[in-house]
Amino acid sequence: EGAALHLEGGGPGAVEPAGAPEGTTITVRDLFYNTPARLKFMRKDSAETAAVNGLMQHLALSHPDISFKFIKDGVEALLTPGDGKLDSAVYAALGRDFARGLVPVSGSGGDITVSGFVTAPLMGRGSRSMQVFFVNGRFIKSQLLTAALEEGYRNQIMKGKFPGCVLSVTLPVTAVDVNVHPAKTQVKFAREHDVFDAVYHTVLDLSLIHISEPTRL
């Protein structure tokens, strides 16, 4: 037996017994019914849907052991298997074409470890939109990590193309500050040079052996 929690208008809700399968289901309806003035500041439905879908993708990629399903207006937009395999989550969340162009990488530098997938040098992309980074399990946007990734591909990728990746960087929690951005999508590293080197050498080791054909997923 499960439990149901209903929240309305931000007030406290009551927890009631409910029959439910294993897992958690979150349903959002009439989000701005009591704050209609905020509704006019929302972007188009397509943009908001893309933002929610992006959030679900990042959650799925950072927790491949959990199955995520995103339903929008009754249509399934995302479903991951939750089998604990990152490549399965990448395939489900980011698509077959992207997943099939990836090769696995892993490396370390002292107490910093780097693991995940990157595109093979001949599978460069037209933008940086498929560069996905996690630090200690948290999705972030980082110019430092982007620079380290792309420096590792220098002279190995076609000019005007960019590598794609799903990379996880793990380091001591004392070596990274996650409270530098309200959305916590940016971090400050205490040892930026060490982090850069760990990512750079992980990618460089791949490019130096001239891998041009991706692993088929």
Locate the predicted segments by residue:
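N-terminal phosphate-binding caps/lids of nucleotide- and nucleic-acid-binding domains
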Residues: 1-212
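Short "domain-exit" segments at the C-terminal end of structured domains
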Residues: 213-217
